[in-house]
């Protein structure tokens, strides 16, 4: 439960204790809140902030001293293209993903000297259960909505989860050894408009 502060604060040390080291942290959890800000409930705001900002912040805060003590490590955050260029009617989501992108750049700069590389993947639309349930919640047919999105992407389709996983795997590998504080867009050629 990433809304549990005590859990988030303790998780990196629990992993190190169990595995012997903490080499890679992938902050991939996220939720999306849709709609204009005046319609957002306090619950929506609190949950979005807890999952999209506070959990990765706490996990990074607890992981960095462990990684520094063992000579380095890698953190990959999942932000969003929307965190770099806001889209319409998602102000809470956009704000939280922009905060995570900014945190990534700050930590990348601040901890590079400790051999800790912090980067973020910034996907556009990805064919996930979260995307499909969002369409359903708005009364849309998910298959038709995804077909419409596919037509808007220069590469002809939205991302599937493997497209994002491949970039995360790259960022967590030695092939990305000179990347630190980078925000890598994975958008099929479709910028947020």
Give the residues covered by each predicted segment.
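Short C-terminal tail/terminal secondary-structure segment
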Residues: 85, 169, 180-193
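Residue(s) in the substrate-gating loop at a strand-loop-helix junction
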Residues: 80
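Active-site loop-to-helix junction immediately N-terminal to the catalytic Tyr of the SDR YXXXK motif
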Residues: 40, 86-94, 106, 134
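Alpha-helical segment proximal to the catalytic Tyr-Lys
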Residues: 65, 109-113, 177
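Active-site helix of classical SDR
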Residues: 60, 96
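Active-site loop immediately N-terminal to the catalytic Tyr-X3-Lys motif
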Residues: 37-38, 85-91, 113-114, 156, ...
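Substrate-binding pocket helix/loop in short-chain dehydrogenase/reductase
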Residues: 36-37, 44-46, 149
């Amino acid at each position: 439960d990433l809304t549990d502060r005590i859990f988030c604060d303790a998780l990196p040390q629990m992993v190190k204790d169990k595995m012997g080291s903490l080499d890679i942290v992938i902050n991939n959890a996220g939720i999306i809140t849709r709609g204009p800000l005046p319609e957002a409930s306090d619950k929506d705001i609190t949950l979005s902030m807890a999952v999209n900002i506070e959990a990765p912040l706490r996990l990074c805060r607890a992981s960095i001293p462990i990684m520094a003590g063992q000579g380095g490590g890698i953190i990959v955050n999942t932000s969003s293209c929307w965190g770099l260029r806001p889209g319409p009617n998602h102000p809470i989501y956009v704000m939280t993903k922009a905060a995570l992108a900014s945190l990534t750049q700050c930590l990348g700069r601040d901890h590079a000297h400790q051999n800790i590389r912090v980067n973020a993947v910034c996907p556009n639309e990805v064919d996930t259960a979260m995307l499909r349930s969002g369409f359903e919640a708005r009364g849309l047919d998910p298959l038709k909505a995804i077909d419409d999105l596919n037509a808007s992407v220069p590469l002809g389709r939205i991302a599937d989860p493997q497209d994002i996983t491949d970039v995360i795997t790259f960022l967590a590998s030695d092939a990305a050894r000179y990347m630190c504080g980078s925000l890598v867009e994975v958008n099929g050629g479709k910028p947020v408009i």
